[in-house]
Every structure is written in structure tokens, then in C-alpha cells.
């Protein structure tokens, strides 16, 4: 499993280097062209669904992109790729959902936070999922010097609706 993940990280990082060699300066500034840094998509799980929906509005561009959108729990670029993005002035937007804890993740949680911390601190802008997410990020990853804001996750109001209250008088029938 680790071999496959490491290979995937290497491939995505290689794509960043290739982009910087052949597409530097070719990025159109009047159009948003995003690279999602290898983040996966799917139907179950917040990150997978978030990227799937974002790709419907902003397709994934492996080359010629002018912005990179990374997620705290999708660490699919290595340090060299992230440094390359910074060197080539490609903005990094980082979505910070949470951090790793010993009680939740177990052994290796500190190393995972260390990896996350690198892209978190080099990002040009950070979206925090909540005040709690920002607090934990500052505690476990360190205080950021860059820009950011709290952007709460959206709720589908067509699916999640308030339950209609039933008034006791309208439903109660007494049989004699």
C-alpha cells in the first residue's frame, strides 16, 4: 500500500516539474486553470466528494494551470513539487480540514502533521473548515504568516431540511 501511495506522489510531483519546464509563462491569467495536486474523487467522504464537485465547475488541468488547490488530507505532492510551484509563482490554495492526533491516527501522527505542515505554511491562501480547524492547525502545525479565512462546509438545503413540527392539537384524536 505504501509503495502505491509513494508512487502516486512521485507521479504527481513529476507532473509539477514537467509543467514548470514546458508551460512556464504560458498560463493564461484571465482564466482559472486549476491543478488539484493529485487529489482523488469519489462519492463517499468529504474530500472525495468536494473534489468531484469542484471538478464539475473547474476541470483538473495537469498542464498549463495557473493555480493549485491542495487539501490537508490529500498529501499527494512532495516537498520538491511544492517548492517548485512557489519558485514559479503559481498560487497554492490550501483547504485545511483537520490535523492528525495520537488518539485518532495512532503511530506516525506527528510525521503526517509534519508533511501537512509543509504545504500549509507555503500556501498562498488557506481555507479553514471551522474555527476549531484553525485552532488545531495553529496548535499542531504552527501559526501561519500567510492569508486565510474560515469557510464553513456547505449544506445541501434541498436534502437537509428542518423537520416539520407537529402540533399536538392537530394530530390528537380521542375515541370514545
Enumerate the language-model features and the residues they cover.
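Alpha-helix capping/helix-boundary segments
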Residues: 75, 132-134
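N-terminal pre-catalytic "stem/leader" segment of glycosyltransferase-like enzymes
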Residues: 1-73
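Conserved donor-binding/catalytic core segment of Leloir-type glycosyltransferases
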Residues: 166-176
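Acidic-and-aromatic substrate-binding clefts and catalytic sites of carbohydrate-active enzymes
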Residues: 68-79, 106
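Carbohydrate-associated surface elements
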Residues: 132, 151-154
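Active-site proximal beta-strand in glycosyltransferases
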Residues: 67-69, 82-102
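Membrane-proximal helix-turn-helix segments that form the acceptor-binding/catalytic region
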Residues: 109-126
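Proline-centered loop/turn at the N-terminus of a beta-strand
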Residues: 91-93, 125, 147, 172
